[in-house]
């Protein structure tokens, strides 16, 4: 009976000992020295700057242990997470844009999103511009472009022609836009040559 009692007491004392663990894991939020991930732009334009080209590069850096980043232009979807620290954007359209970055640890903890707003003013008008400048499509897709009059004022008539590669695409239709507003009756004459790869447009407005 005495031996059994001693064994019981020893087991009880062992099970009540306080366990201690080293909290030195930098990715453990319970670590008193834990820092949340951060991302910072480097070597980029200032907030709200205007650029006079249609392409731009962004560079950034994350805090220690940030493993991946993702980026987003304007209201487009986020790109996939990767370990790149720079990104180049080409064929930007005229006007206001925003570029956003977010980083995360390997544990999945993400940083706050940082955003840089800027304006593209790459065209010195008067000029005719395709909008958007670039659109990526697959074979068989139908896509729509606009032709904009950039820095053109008091326009009453226009005539122009553009060419394209007929082995890569064909023009299905052309419609008049709203460049003339409500100034009067709009005349819109087009000629599409899908064999030769050219389009001619003549348009004018007749007011009262």
Regions found by a protein language model. Name each.
Residues 85-88, 143, 197-199:
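Short strand-edge motifs at loop-to-beta-strand transitions and within beta-strands
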Residues 12-15:
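C-terminal motif of bacterial Sec signal peptides marking the signal peptidase cleavage site
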Residues 2-8:
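Sec-dependent signal peptide recognition
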Residues 122-144:
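Boundary/junction segments of secreted and surface-exposed precursor proteins
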Residues 148, 182-208:
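Structured beta-strand segments within beta-sheet-rich domains
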Residues 136-183:
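Low-complexity, serine/threonine/proline/glycine-rich extracellular segments that form mucin-like
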Residues 17-125:
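Low-complexity, disordered linker/stalk regions enriched in Pro/Thr/Ser/Gly
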Residues 43-50, 131-137, 149:
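Short beta-strand segments of immunoglobulin-like
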């Amino acid at each position: 009976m005495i031996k059994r009692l001693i064994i019981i007491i020893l087991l009880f004392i062992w099970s009540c000992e306080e366990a201690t663990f080293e909290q030195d894991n930098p990715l453990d939020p319970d670590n008193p020295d834990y820092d949340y991930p951060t991302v910072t732009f480097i070597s980029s334009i200032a907030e709200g700057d205007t650029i006079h080209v249609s392409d731009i590069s962004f560079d950034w850096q994350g805090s220690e242990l940030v493993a991946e980043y993702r980026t987003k232009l304007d209201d487009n979807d986020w790109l996939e997470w990767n370990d790149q620290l720079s990104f180049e954007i080409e064929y930007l359209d005229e006007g206001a844009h925003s570029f956003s970055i977010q980083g995360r640890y390997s544990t999945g903890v993400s940083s706050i999103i940082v955003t840089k707003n800027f304006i593209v003013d790459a065209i010195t008008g008067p000029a005719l511009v395709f909008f958007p400048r670039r659109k990526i499509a697959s074979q068989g897709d139908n896509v729509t472009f606009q032709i904009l009059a950039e820095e053109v004022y008091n326009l009453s008539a226009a005539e122009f022609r553009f060419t394209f590669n007929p082995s890569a695409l064909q023009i299905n239709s052309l419609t008049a836009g709203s460049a003339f507003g409500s100034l009067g009756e709009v005349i819109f004459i087009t000629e599409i040559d899908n064999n030769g790869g050219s389009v001619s447009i003549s348009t004018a407005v007749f007011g009262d």
